[in-house]
Amino acid sequence: MERKFSDQELIRRTHLQELKNQNKNPFLITKVDRSMFLKDFAEKYKNFSKEELHNMDLEKLTLAGRLIGIRQTFGIIQDFSAKLQIYINKKNVAPEVFSTFKSLDIGDIIELEGVAMKTNSDEITLNVTNIRLVAKSLKVLPEKYHGLVDEEIKARQRYLDLIVNDETKNTFIKRSLIIREMRNWLDNKGFFEVETPVLQDILSGAAARPFITHHNTLNKEYYLRIATEIALKKCIIGGFEKVYEIGRIFRNEGMDSTHNPEFTSVELYIAYVDLWYIMQLTEDLIRHIATKLNLLNPTFRGFSIDLNKPFKKAHMVDLINEYVGVNFFEVKSDEQAIELAKKHHVKLLDHQKNFGHIVNAFFETFVEEKLVEPTFVYGHPLQVSPLTKKNQSDPRFVDRFELFICQKEFANAYSEINDPIDQYERFIAQLEEAKLGNDEASELDMEFIEALEYGMPPTGGLGIGVDRLVMLLTSNDSIRNVLLFPHMKDKTK
């Protein structure tokens, strides 16, 4: 396939060919012996004056980075740690060194040898004595003052976004620190980290449409996991009393500002605790991460949030009553619930024409958008919670909560079903829903039922969407901005 290049790209390719003709092909270089990172260089010499540096017998150091700016005999290079000014004096270097400097293009990756100096403006600078080109940039970086602002290009060409936008790089540094702090906190609380299969032969653990793949050797269809829940509960059954997994989840569903087909979640399970214990743990975990990284006051979706304030708690039915004026505690039949849905113009699919789904539909239609401050919503209906213990006071509901912040769900937690008979009946009910068109219904997982029959202690479980938490803490409104390489529609579509 013939490729077309811009005039600038052709000039750069000509420069590369000239280097090859001189036996200076930069792509043959395999190693650079750096003395230190740019940030460390600046830190080492920042407290010396211009005169002190000039009069000191300084050691020559080797630095490396990408050239991102040139102005006469000055330049700017950057590595992962920082940016640094460089300076070359034609009178003090060999002619071929100065010639190499003048032939460089913005974006080139270079090795530099030199000593520290300060300019009249007191800026730490590398006084260059030698230069070697170690990778030629054949593409032109975005122009300095306008930068890279097109969100589509930033997501498709994240490597370019990272080169030119410090804000993007800092977001992904924070993402790494958030996950690290989450892991450290759980480890320090005595949790045991495990890894469970991505390929699963039963669809369960969440309400979601799966990706399906084929195992050639076994000649068998598998799902990419939609949750880690079932496998982690098996660990609890096996005797691990505090387990967690941070890993990729795959759901074959729509894409929008808060959803990507593959995403990262943390799920954890603790034996001998209930929903209320998990609720406090969730608040403690999020606040700890935000405090540790100084991210307690993010702005998300146009709302300013204070994560240091106690999180609110409310029953789902009470919230519906508050915002809609309908008290579902007083509704005694599916027929009554259906009439209320008609009255309030709540659309229902065939499998949703029952009390539980209608309560949930009211909540999603009228209440979610009202929940700005961090709020634990508990008391979900039984029909939408097939893996959750029934509430002992009102078995139409279950011991489950979701955490909402700025109108979006961030966490989902249960007192887990440990009664294998109840769990079997719930799976059968899910099969009936599937017949009515619910393509997110769970399958009958007999292996899990048999595992439960050996006995699982009372258990509390929690799932948190890591990407969405990163969005909140870094004040990013789009999930694409916190995923290094998000899924995108084809350019031609």
From Swiss-Prot:
It is an enzyme of class 6 (ligase). It is found in: Cytoplasm. Binds 3 Mg(2+) ions per subunit. The keyword Nucleotide-binding applies. GO terms for biological process: lysyl-tRNA aminoacylation. It catalyses: tRNA(Lys) + L-lysine + ATP = L-lysyl-tRNA(Lys) + AMP + diphosphate. Its EC number is 6.1.1.6. GO terms for molecular function: ATP binding; lysine-tRNA ligase activity; magnesium ion binding; tRNA binding. The keyword Nucleotide-binding applies. One of its GO terms (cellular component) is cytosol. Mg(2+) 2 binds at E409. Gene3D superfamilies: Bira Bifunctional Protein, Domain 2, Nucleic acid-binding proteins. InterPro entries: Aa-tRNA-synt_II, aa-tRNA-synth_II, aa-tRNA-synth_II/BPL/LPL, Lys-tRNA-ligase_II, Lys-tRNA-ligase_II_N, Lys-tRNA-synth_II_C, NA-bd_OB-fold, NA-bd_OB_tRNA. CDD domains: LysRS_core, LysRS_N. Coiled coil: none annotated. Its cofactor is Mg(2+). Signal peptide: none annotated. Keywords: Aminoacyl-tRNA synthetase, ATP-binding, Cytoplasm, Ligase, Magnesium, Metal-binding, Nucleotide-binding, Protein biosynthesis. Mg(2+) 1 binds at E402, E409. Homodimer. Belongs to the class-II aminoacyl-tRNA synthetase family. This is Lysine--tRNA ligase. It comes from Ureaplasma parvum serovar 3 (strain ATCC 700970).
